[in-house]
Amino acid sequence: QDLKFSANFKLPFKNGNKLKFGAKVVRKTKDKAVDFYEYSPLDEDAFMENSLKNTVDQSNKHFMPNSKYQTGIYASKEYTGALDLNNPALFEKEQVQEELAGNFEARETVSSGYVRFDSKITDRIELMSGLRIENTNLAYTGRTYDADEDITGKTERQRNSYINFLPSLLVKWNVNDDFKVRGSFTQTLSRPKYSALVPSVNIKRSDNEITIGNPELKPTTSYNFDLSADYYFRSIGLVSAGIFYKKIDDFIVDQVSTNYEYQGNVYTRFTQPKNTGNANLLGVELSYQRDFGFIAPALKCIGFYGTYTYTHSRVEDFNFEGRENEEGLSMPGSPAHTANASLYFEKAGLNIRVSYNFASDFIDEMGESTFYDRYYDKVNYMDANASYTFGKKIKTTFYAEANNLLNQPL
């Protein structure tokens, strides 16, 4: 449930200058309350006999893996849908405690105010400057779960609050009607996920593993510097190049430790999200978009869009027990190379598009040493979609799509 209240004001001045200011309050209530039950037939022999009489072959020869994966025989949906699971004369019902471990109650209130001034320095130079202040208040309740003893309990309510000042400065230089240069400095904020903040404790004693939440997580903040140049073609399209730098503080990573002591017990595997350190990112981005009408007018219905981004990242002040002195680490979740490309055809209501996406490998999860780090492999995705719209008074659209044409493992 989200409740939002906001007020915005604008004061115009001479020469096109404007002052904008306002306030906003957002209160979010997010509860996860899942009840999961297992049903066991009281007469297993009769249940098995009836199930085997109501089966259907779910194999589909048009399924992409073909003979590599055959679904096989399953109970029919008509049979399973008609089962009277809540009839105590037929089934025994038991709640699954493990599913309750993921339940939580979360309350988040963000109160913010901003002021922004838009000014025209000259006929070709525009300046936008502003400041946003956000006050965040959090309250979370999670669950504790002991997998071997099948016990679920409720944690104490955890609270946290913080204030952030987020300045911004943007400059746009209209060199001419077709060429524009932009520069900006901003400070941004990224709050932790609900699932990371919940003070939950999940223990699996048979494997001697424990996973806990972290209600003391700080938000990740970033100072951002961007400079870009865009050239717009007289026909539809543009080519642009940009450079960016980000100074990121308190980024969050799932830290995994082995033989870790927690509340008097030593666990073979201990997992918890933590603010792991700071990082510097430097990168360049190139993009191009244009239809092929400049080659021949008949090709105006065909176009291309592509972007490429290179990012170089380095971690500083690494806050991981046993790895504080490591150097040369890349920021988790930050691939060095990403690319997107799309070839499209648009004419007379027919739209066809083929898209390609690439991301190089990157660190996904960090362990107590490089040996335990987990990497996400490089990925190549290709998708295609087509639609056709016809009709004047009543428009009708047919749409089709095909995903993961390169059969990239997910």
What are these regions (language model features)?
Residues 98, 102-111, 160, 189-248, ...:
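Outer-membrane beta-barrel signature, preferentially recognizing the C-terminal barrel domain
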Residues 10-19, 34, 123-124, 178, ...:
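Short loop/turn motifs that connect adjacent beta-strands in outer-membrane beta-barrel proteins
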Residues 9-11, 115, 119-121, 125, ...:
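Residue-level signature of outer-membrane beta-barrel architecture
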Residues 1-13, 18-22, 108-174, 299, ...:
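Surface-exposed extracellular loop regions of Gram-negative outer-membrane beta-barrel proteins
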Residues 1, 5-10, 17-20, 169, ...:
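Conserved C-terminal beta-signal and adjacent last beta-strands/turns
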Residues 23-31, 133-139, 185-191, 200, ...:
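Transmembrane beta-strands of outer-membrane beta-barrel pores
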Residues 1, 44-102, 258-261, 265-272, ...:
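Flexible glycine-rich, low-complexity coil/linker segments exposed to the extracellular/periplasmic environment
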Residues 5, 245-248, 257, 265-363:
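Gram-negative outer-membrane beta-barrel transporters
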